[in-house]
Amino acid sequence: TKHPRPTTNNPENCFEYFFAQRESVETIVYLYEVVECRNPQDLLKYDIHGSIVISMFEESWFRLVTKQATGTGKTKVLSVLLVWSYFHKTYEDDSDLSRNFLLITPNIIVLDRIRTDFDGLKIFFDDPLLPPNGYDDQNWNSDFQLSLHIQDEVGTLNKKGNIFLTNIHRVYDRKDSHPSYDDENTMDYFLGDKPVTKTQNNKVVLRDIVRDIDELLIMNDEAHHIHDSKLSWFKSIQDIHNNLLQKNCRLSLQIDVTATPKHDNGNIFVQTVSDYPLVEAIAQRVVKRPVLPD
């Protein structure tokens, strides 16, 4: 659907999601809502080649991965899915989804890029994500009340919903996780723990907060970093899920977006449900075509 979004220079300007963005969102919504997939076993019936077995799924919770080439708008996909989960939990009876979201990035560079969209929750109001109040007899704008918490700067938790935006290092449980040569980022292993700086010296520890809430949906940007169950990133999510199980709850869903959903051996993640490669993005002029000098 095209959404009118006039500007000074172009009064007829319209906003429209790319096909690949819509495909990623629609695939996840279809698997969850239409065919009601809730665990790794439910995905096996869609393997038409019969090459996937349950032992290939290293997690016991429901995880879905979308492959999107760099520069094709992964943040847009995450924002749509976040709104979908929020209103599903708000308006649907017995919804298993969540109004609390842990959005994990691999490093500060990626976090700062996403933060420009999420600061002030502006992406949800700049993009056509919220239907007007009264549509389908619901107060969409009024009911969309989320609090944004960045890194360990956690304010009062909002009973109506929270977004925790962080890099993965804030989620590690340092008591159980020590720097290792096998880590994706070996800097701490070789150089030791980073010194505490003014911006790191926070009173609230994010990893303790997310382990204490009763409902949570996790989103991972640049999710190719979770390619091994031995890595601290995977173990941190597993720990969150296990804590929820102890409270008779569970992780609502894990959604991963990455341009390279592959293990070190080259095998694609079995949880991958949509694929938008760079070659296709270039051909459709979604990203710039590289030019080689003579």
Annotated model-derived regions:
Residues 1-294:
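RecA-like P-loop NTPase motor core of helicase/translocase proteins
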